Amino acid sequence: MTSETSTSGRKVAVVTGASSGIGAATAKQFAAEGFRVVLGARREDKLEAVAEEIRAAGGEATVYKVDVTSDDDVVALAKAEPRVDVLVNNAGGAWGMESVEGAVEEKWRWMYDVNVLGTLRVTRALLPALKTTSGIVLTVGSIAGRQVYTGGAGYNAAKHAERALVEVLRQEVAADGVRVTEIDPGRVHTDFSLVRFDGDETKAAAVYDGVESLTADDVADIIVFAATRPKRVNIDFLQVTPIDQVGGAKPKK
């Protein structure tokens, strides 16, 4: 963990999966809004690069190596950060595109662990702090949690389960003044597909070839907007897609 000690009393935004893509873009935008940002992910070198960019722009950033599938990592984060105003559950991912018949259970377990149990672990650990500040939990889901597609069963199942978790949580903590929002993006041009295809750059590039995808900043804009509404305003969920994916349409490629 590295940090820059702050006595400014700034609000604190915790972002998981903050080493690249949507997480990194979200952290930078929260910093620009005056938050001290807490960056968590597995790739500490990349986290440091994001943090240095934030600090160079006059912001405050703290870095923790956090694997959301590790109870120890998550508990350590919660102990180190007693104040949390915003939690962005962004860590997640897909692995493979096998059919149901060809399903690889190891991949299904990993997707459930990182997308569902990862969100559970971090949210559960930070809820006491969020209740103290009447904060907000924002979870980056996916249109895969609302629409299914061939080859996506493992990821679809995980994201549907994550959505159920979020919807129950919203009901359970409303009386504590904690807002709960889900942001469900469609196709975003990040490292998502590179991870899904085990680093196969050709397969990953084909996902984005010939279509205009959302950018990480597009999604970060929406996350920060939802988080900065008045405390009386709860946005249950927002679904955002590139124009070729509206209404569940297949990309025009």
Question: Which sequence ranges carry the predicted segments?
Answer:
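Residue(s) in the substrate-gating loop at a strand-loop-helix junction
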Residues: 142
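The beta1-alpha1 cofactor-binding region of Rossmann-like NAD(H)/NADP(H)-dependent oxidoreductases
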Residues: 45, 64-76, 105
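C-terminal helical subdomain
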Residues: 182-186, 201-249
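Substrate-binding pocket helix/loop in short-chain dehydrogenase/reductase
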Residues: 98-100, 107-109
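Conserved glycine-rich Rossmann-like NAD(P)H-binding loop of the short-chain dehydrogenase/reductase
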Residues: 33-48
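Conserved glycine-rich cofactor-binding loop
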Residues: 19-20
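Active-site helix of classical SDR
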Residues: 123, 158
